Amino acid sequence: MSQSTAYIILNILVILAGCFITACGIYLFVNGLFHSIIGFVLGIYYLLAGVCIVLLEIVFPQKLVNLFGFYTYWFGKGALISLIGLLILGNSGFFLAAGIIVIAVGIVCMIFHFLLGCPRPLINRSVERKPEPQGQHA
């Protein structure tokens, strides 16, 4: 398998994980609206996180590279996805399955950090991480 094929497969896996996170967010948002404020807030959190993961996987604007530098590495991407997967884990079948799938995708990303270079978004594959200038502090 070539390196570009591995990038595309991992991008698709991360998009799948983002879709699971979004689905959990929609479910919790709708149910939490009437039952508990915690479910409502977690639903919004999962919804925003899932949509952002999917969008950043498709296109990663250059302006966001310095703000989300950890997301330009497979390990940072995998750690974020695994953390969200741990939060999703629940007693019901859907949340348990979604949490396990999301955690597995995160672990795969962290493993591939040591085997592949930096990830690229699906559409604008020319985005590269720019090093910060030395000697300038905000």
UniProtKB/Swiss-Prot annotation:
It is found in: Membrane. It is a multi-pass membrane protein. Its main location: membrane. GO terms for biological process: vesicle-mediated transport. Induction: Developmentally regulated, is also induced by heat shock and cold shock. The chain crosses the membrane at residues 12-30, 32-56, 71-90, 93-118. GO terms for cellular component: Golgi membrane. It holds the Pfam family COPI_assoc. Keywords: Membrane, Transmembrane, Transmembrane helix. The keyword Membrane applies. This is Membrane protein P8A7. The gene is pmpA.
